[in-house]
UniProtKB/Swiss-Prot annotation:
Tissue expression: Highly expressed in testis. Also expressed in kidney, heart, skeletal muscles and brain.
Primary site of residence: secreted
Lineage of source species: Eukaryota, Metazoa, Chordata, Craniata, Vertebrata
A GO molecular function held by the record: receptor antagonist activity
UniProt protein name: Humanin-like 2
């Protein structure tokens, strides 16, 4: 649903949250 750029930016912003980062990476 969200653009790849947005997801990439989101991952960049939450680089501290590794679990969340991995989860988002798996979702997107």
């Amino acid at each position: 649903m969200a653009p790849r750029g947005f997801s990439c930016l989101l991952l960049s912003t939450s680089e501290i949250d590794l679990p969340v980062k991995r989860l988002l990476s798996s979702v997107f």
